[in-house]
């Protein structure tokens, strides 16, 4: 039995299949940990989501910022859904969209296996969060996503503010937690995220640190595997194992074996970026489904009017 963590797929279905072949993945005995951002930009997001969904009995998934954006898109009106890029549009118009999105909404922000000694997140942790605190805060938001009021959470999750504080409440608290788990790269020693700095360490503004190198951060009792930061490349430092190696940008897709005495890294080449992503043309919604989908979309749209302006639905926050 092997446990493999895999970096950001971002809709690169063919590349994901090649990586699974290279690690000799056997669903009868192996387990996959997906570090989030299953979808968007790679051109094969529907196929990728279906693949991971089909492996749900043999895998663990944490949500990334692109996954949450897909859920937000799926909860909006049909008119708004049609504004997204064709890669994501194919998902929200697919016959099995409800099964895929309902399953995705049930996934975690953080996964912990204390027997194995690992925690998986998508992006980062607040400097003062222990793994126990991180797990507790992740469960807060997961319960909201998995509950009946999830549409309201998805409408209110966008924005860079406020920074994390233990005294936050309501959607401000949920937003701050989501931003830490799914958008973090650099931050201040007090844990305030710098969303505009996305390059390699050394290029950031003064006073900012990679989240895993912040002075005064707490010592953590688990090794951490994460994705999100493709510019960082494969990085193993301070107990953190960052494995988003930019498959969607022409880099590599990386798998890291978590249950071996010596860390084993397996990679395959990423997507060719000389041309457009290999996305199929977005299908028309079947005529017999239009009434039901429009009705569901209108219910969601009633709440959108009070939510104020939102970011473009085809530009997930990084």
Swiss-Prot record:
EC numbers: 3.6.1.41
GO MF annotation: an example: bis(5'-nucleosyl)-tetraphosphatase (symmetrical) activity
Alphabetical UniProt keywords: Hydrolase
Compositionally skewed regions (Basic residues) per UniProt: 282-297
Compositionally biased residues, Low complexity: 298-311
InterPro entries: ApaH (IPR004617), Calcineurin-like_PHP_ApaH (IPR004843), Metallo-depent_PP-like (IPR029052), Ser/Thr-sp_prot-phosphatase (IPR006186)
Database matches in Pfam families: Metallophos
Catalysed transformations (reactions): P(1),P(4)-bis(5'-adenosyl) tetraphosphate + H2O = 2 ADP + 2 H(+)
Residue ranges, annotated region (Disordered): 269-318
CDD domains, per database record: MPP_ApaH
Enzyme class: hydrolase
Entry similarity comment: Belongs to the Ap4A hydrolase family.
Record function comment: Hydrolyzes diadenosine 5',5'''-P1,P4-tetraphosphate to yield ADP.
Protein name: Bis(5'-nucleosyl)-tetraphosphatase, symmetrical
Organism whose genome encodes this protein: Xanthomonas euvesicatoria pv. vesicatoria (strain 85-10) (Xanthomonas campestris pv. vesicatoria)
Gene field: apaH
